[in-house]
């Protein structure tokens, strides 16, 4: 009896192991499947491919603003670690699907691709060395991860750096 139960249990587990399809590990992002797709369809989470990136984003003392401009979007970033350790800058952001190409105006060579995840913007963990010129002391923009607080252009346009300069404008 115990043996028959063990065999039946193994067969049930084997049936739960998936359909035999291999996961796409080529680096190409496919359409969301399973739970994520169901959540997007139900409206529980926003579809990053169809969401506007405009808004004010934050986490703790990290702030990002994104506003539309004539040709793309303007982005402003301010990160404050205290003790005069901060980063700040403005630039241009262009979007292709879930990828955001960020270029800071003040610094040649400070451009990189970030991710847009519906209501979050995530910078890569490693940025070009030139981006460190936007920062004082040991502060860094690498790995910045912020969530949207507001979709309002007027709120996003009010973000300032540590010296009181506006980082985003509402257009060119």
List PLM regions with ranges.
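C-terminal motif of bacterial Sec signal peptides marking the signal peptidase cleavage site
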Residues: 13-15
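N-terminal glycine/threonine-rich, aromatic-flanked beta-hairpin/loop signature
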Residues: 62-99
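Extracytosolic low-complexity repeat regions of secreted or lipid-anchored proteins
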Residues: 113-150
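A composition-driven surface/loop motif
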Residues: 30, 55-58, 73-74, 102-106, ...
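Tryptophan-anchored aromatic micro-motifs
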Residues: 27-65, 125, 145-171
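Bacterial signal peptide processing site
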Residues: 17-19
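Sec-dependent signal peptide recognition
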Residues: 2-7
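Short, hydrophobic/aromatic-rich segments at coil-to-beta transitions
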Residues: 49-57, 71-76, 95-103, 122
């Amino acid at each position: 009896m115990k043996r028959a139960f063990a065999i039946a249990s193994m067969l049930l587990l084997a049936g739960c192991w998936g359909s035999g399809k291999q996961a796409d590990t080529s680096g190409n992002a496919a359409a969301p499947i399973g739970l994520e797709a169901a959540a997007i369809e139900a409206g529980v989470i926003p579809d990053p491919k169809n969401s506007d990136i405009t808004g004010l984003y934050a986490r703790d003392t990290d702030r990002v603003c994104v506003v539309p401009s004539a040709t793309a979007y303007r982005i402003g970033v301010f990160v404050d670690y205290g003790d005069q350790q901060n980063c700040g800058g403005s630039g241009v952001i262009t979007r292709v699907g879930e990828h955001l190409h960020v270029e800071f105006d003040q610094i040649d060579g400070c451009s990189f691709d970030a991710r847009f995840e519906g209501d979050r913007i995530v910078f890569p963990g490693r940025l070009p060395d030139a981006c460190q010129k936007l920062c004082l002391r040991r502060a860094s923009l690498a790995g910045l991860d912020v969530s949207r607080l507001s979709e309002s252009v007027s709120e996003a346009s009010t973000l300032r750096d540590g010296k009181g300069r506006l980082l985003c404008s509402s257009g060119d």
